[in-house]
UniProtKB/Swiss-Prot annotation:
Misc note: Partially overlaps DST1.
Compartment annotation: Membrane
Predominant location: membrane
Protein name: Putative uncharacterized protein YGL042C
GO terms under cellular component: membrane
Keyword terms: Membrane, Transmembrane, Transmembrane helix
Transmembrane segments: 3-23, 39-59
Membrane topology classification: Multi-pass membrane protein
Amino acid sequence: MYIVYEYAISTNWIWLYVWLFLFLDSGCQILLRIESEQAFLSLPPIVSFALSVATLIFFYSKRISICYHMLHMYRKWSMVHPQILFAIDSKIPSSLYIYHM
């Protein structure tokens, strides 16, 4: 199994985007396999709801400080090197910008 980042990055489902990054270094060894948009949309509503709840639980835990620190460093670095991060910035969902404030 493997994690497909591009799908999470290219969509506006911020909960999936955050969920992937929260679990990436958590040591929980949770792997998510999404082969296509159709496969994701065919997930049962209860699975989608469970992922959303998991995101909220972990986002409001101690990991929120790590996430905030990463976003703060991203903002600081993007001011120094805007031309380098332009490609990365264009892939971040617009709903993520609310956390930059």
